[in-house]
């Protein structure tokens, strides 16, 4: 509710707002009909209310952005480079990476080596692209100038990997689900490509994100509908695991943080993006047109444009987030 009080300049007849009721206000009431003031106040309040409502709808309403089935149903792992280009895996066929330029044009950026299929893309501080290759059990590195692809890290004991995220110091964390058995693992890959198993016997680890300050790691378990949070130690190991949020119904997939510490989570088959605040409370569910969001990323000039990959539509949807995204 918005409360508005008014006063009148006797010389000019102009009406202006005041913060509290004063004797002058009572005198003013004698000069003007209260009905006129109520009409003006109602109009101003209505304009203010509509402005707030329209702004909220613009922030939290997703829209289509490109033709359906531009990518395959395996579209995943979106990421934006320093020039504003948007990337995702499986452009028109499996084993590729597609590029969507700021002007909306799109095409195949590169084809991965035979036997490799990407599932997640991130950009390192070196400007190069890193790809979770779930069929090859690799983290691939792509030189963005030459498009040369190399194996940055390989671990045959990985089930996949599925999703990856950078910490501020260059460490990579990887989720590693075992879908048939509904189990999962967490891995750490250091800047010198050393691979370490952090935790096993988890649920189906899927989406993974680092907090805005780089001090916490979030991991969700799709089948178990749980989101966990860890404290990140200086050496990259994890401690103080605790339950952050539990959902009811529908699965989860990729997720990202914004600069205020809010967490955006893809609700697979529900067709929404769940927005959790830093305390783990569900603040909003952003409705999408498609039903199978697989991941999301932030981009645009102000880093508030959120791009969501939709597997049932084979394309992106987009919405304006309240705050800029945080990427490492």
Regions found by a protein language model. Give the residues of each.
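A short loop-to-beta-strand structural motif that recurs across blades of beta-propeller domains
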Residues: 96-98, 138-140, 185-187, 226-228, ...
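Short loop/turn segments that connect beta-strands within beta-propeller blades
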Residues: 100-105, 143-147, 189-193, 232-235, ...
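Beta-rich, blade/repeat-based domains predominating
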Residues: 69-86, 113-133, 138, 155-183, ...
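A short helix->beta-strand "capping" segment at the edge of beta-propeller domains
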Residues: 57-71, 241
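Glycine/small-residue-rich hydrophobic helix-like segments
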Residues: 232-295
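Beta-propeller fold detector
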Residues: 108-111, 150-154, 197-200, 239-245, ...
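Beta-propeller domains
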Residues: 88-106
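Bacterial Sec-dependent N-terminal signal peptides
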Residues: 1-8, 14-58
């Amino acid at each position: 509710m918005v409360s508005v009080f008014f006063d009148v300049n006797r010389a000019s007849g102009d009406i202006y707002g005041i913060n509290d009721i004063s004797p002058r206000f009572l005198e003013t009431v004698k000069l003007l009909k209260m009905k006129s003031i109520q009409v003006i106040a109602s109009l101003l309040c209505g304009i203010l209310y509509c402005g707030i409502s329209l702004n909220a709808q613009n922030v939290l309403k997703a829209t289509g952005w490109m033709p359906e089935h531009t990518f395959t149903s395996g579209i995943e792992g979106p990421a934006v480079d320093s020039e504003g280009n948007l990337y995702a895996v499986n452009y028109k066929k499996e084993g590729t990476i597609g590029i969507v330029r700021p002007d909306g044009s799109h095409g195949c950026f590169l084809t991965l080596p035979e036997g490799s299929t990407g599932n997640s893309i991130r950009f390192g501080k070196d400007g190069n692209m890193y790809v979770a290759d779930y069929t090859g059990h690799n983290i691939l590195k792509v030189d963005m100038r030459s498009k040369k692809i190399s194996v940055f890290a390989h671990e045959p004991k990985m089930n996949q990997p599925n999703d990856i995220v950078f910490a501020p110091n260059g460490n990579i964390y990887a989720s590693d689900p075992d879908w048939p058995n509904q189990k999962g693992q967490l891995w750490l890959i250091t800047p010198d490509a050393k691979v370490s198993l952090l935790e096993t016997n988890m649920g189906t680890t899927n989406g993974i994100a680092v907090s805005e300050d780089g001090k916490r790691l979030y991991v969700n378990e799709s089948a178990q509908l749980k989101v966990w949070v860890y404290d990140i130690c200086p050496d990259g190991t994890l401690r103080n695991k605790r339950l952050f949020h539990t959902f009811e119904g529908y699965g989860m997939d990729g997720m990202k943080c914004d600069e205020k510490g809010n967490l955006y989570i893809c609700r697979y088959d529900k067709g929404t993006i769940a927005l959790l605040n830093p305390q783990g409370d569900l603040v909003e569910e952003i409705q999408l047109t498609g039903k199978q969001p697989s991941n999301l990323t932030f981009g645009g000039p102000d880093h508030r444009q959120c791009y969501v990959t939709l597997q049932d539509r084979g394309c992106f949807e987009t919405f304006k987030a309240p705050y800029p995204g945080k990427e490492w």
